[in-house]
Amino acid sequence: MSLIGKEVLPFEAKAFKNGEFIDVTNEDLKGQWSVFCFYPADFSFVCPTELEDLQEQYAALKELGVEVYSVSTDTHFVHKGWHDSSEKISKITYAMIGDPSQTISRNFDVLDEETGLADRGTFIIDPDGVIQTVEINAGGIGRDASNLVNKVKAAQYVRQNPGEVCPAKWEEGGETLTPSLDLVGKI
């Protein structure tokens, strides 16, 4: 079942951010754009490369009014341990949510019930708490955060410009389309 267009289900969680443990709920997503980046496990292989890449794009996402949350089924304590022991992860300044109950991973339909780990899933959530994009990758395939920045820009553009759509390879300032009878068969 697709989660696009669905409101994020209620959750409460603990996260590690900037040397502190914080509380995060679905209500924190309201009023701003958010990105949820699920990954299988701390102290693994592809995950630290993805999270470091996401940190490298964090300033660009913040400029767009986006808050970033990474999520795994590890606890917030494990996130702190990983942050304190990994050169790549020590750079992270966005919230690292612990989901040991698997509630959030299940709510976003990324939980692998067999392993108890989250799949690699990325979700862009609008200021109303509604999921606008979903990307799920196989465990061995890392994500590119620069593509994520462009997807956020496209989602924001479409929200601000009802009736327009962003075609493939759209970049900010690029040409958009206005679906109409006139365009049928001409693209």
UniProtKB/Swiss-Prot annotation:
It is found in: Cytoplasm. The active site is at 47 (cysteine sulfenic acid (-soh) intermediate). One of its GO terms (molecular function) is thioredoxin peroxidase activity. It catalyses: a hydroperoxide + NADH + H(+) = an alcohol + NAD(+) + H2O. InterPro entries: AhpC (IPR017559), AhpC/TSA (IPR000866), Peroxiredoxin (IPR050217), Peroxiredoxin_AhpC-typ (IPR024706), Peroxiredoxin_C (IPR019479), Thioredoxin-like_sf (IPR036249), Thioredoxin_domain (IPR013766). Residues 2-157 form the Thioredoxin domain. The keyword Disulfide bond applies. Belongs to the peroxiredoxin family. AhpC/Prx1 subfamily. The active site is a conserved redox-active cysteine residue, the peroxidatic cysteine (C(P)), which makes the nucleophilic attack on the peroxide substrate. The peroxide oxidizes the C(P)-SH to cysteine sulfenic acid (C(P)-SOH), which then reacts with another cysteine residue, the resolving cysteine (C(R)), to form a disulfide bridge. The disulfide is subsequently reduced by an appropriate electron donor to complete the catalytic cycle. In this typical 2-Cys peroxiredoxin, C(R) is provided by the other dimeric subunit to form an intersubunit disulfide. Thiol-specific peroxidase that catalyzes the reduction of hydrogen peroxide and organic hydroperoxides to water and alcohols, respectively. Plays a role in cell protection against oxidative stress by detoxifying peroxides. This is Alkyl hydroperoxide reductase C. The gene is ahpC.
